[in-house]
A protein has these predicted regions:
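Catalytic phosphate/metal-binding cores of nucleic-acid and nucleotide-processing enzymes, i.e., regions
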Residues: 1-114
């Protein structure tokens, strides 16, 4: 599988959360994460790599910048790794927020963890 195909799969999975926004990076945007999204107001910025590869120093820097801004971040080599990053990040963000929104986030995670 090509990296772009894996990223599309991840982006469309994020879009399936409902009330989600996703974008796949376009060429020429140096260092920007491959997949960007927002689920229930929680920003997601993740980088996809083929197995055996890792992000460039610039990509690591951008991921850290987004993390400091409060986004769910990480990098993955498989679809399953991407799912774990997003679901674990959503669960972490659910702590300390109002109960109604927390219930929505946890319900989404339960639905998509399968």
């Amino acid at each position: 599988m090509k990296e772009v195909d894996m990223n599309k799969q991840v982006a469309y999975w994020i879009n399936g959360f409902g009330r989600a926004y996703k974008r796949i990076a376009t060429p020429g945007r140096v260092g920007e994460p491959d997949v960007s999204g927002c689920v229930l107001g929680i920003r997601i910025e993740i980088e996809g790599k083929l197995p055996g590869n890792k992000p460039t120093p610039m990509q690591f820097k951008k991921l850290e910048w987004w993390k400091q801004a409060g986004a769910i971040t990480g990098w993955y080599c498989t679809f399953r790794e991407a799912q774990e990053i997003v679901i674990n990040g959503l669960i972490q963000h659910a702590e300390g927020i109002d109960e109604k929104r927390k219930a929505k986030i946890l319900a989404i995670c339960k639905r998509f963890k399968k």
